[in-house]
Regions:
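A short, exposed loop/beta-hairpin motif centered on an aromatic-Gly-Thr core
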Residues: 28-40, 56
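Short aromatic-glycine-(Arg/Gly/Cys) micro-motifs in beta-strand/loop hairpins
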Residues: 5-32
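Short, compact, well-ordered microdomains
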Residues: 45-56
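Aromatic side chains
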Residues: 4-5, 19, 38, 52
């Protein structure tokens, strides 16, 4: 299962983006929150909503 992260910075469209380990758009280490291992992005987004309300 891959690791997922959420960007601490808000995107111009207003949400915090979730990224899978290895993503070419992965935020810098200081700009991301580790979410954990998930078998799919939907579960990772659910976890990210514990930190931020507007997540994609």
């Amino acid at each position: 299962m891959p690791s997922y992260y959420v960007n601490k910075n808000i995107q111009p469209t207003g949400e915090h983006e979730v990224h899978k380990e290895g993503c070419h758009r992965m935020p810098e280490l200081q700009n991301r929150v580790y979410l954990g291992y998930f078998s799919n992005a939907i579960d990772a987004v659910r976890e990210a909503r514990r930190y931020y309300t507007n997540v994609d």
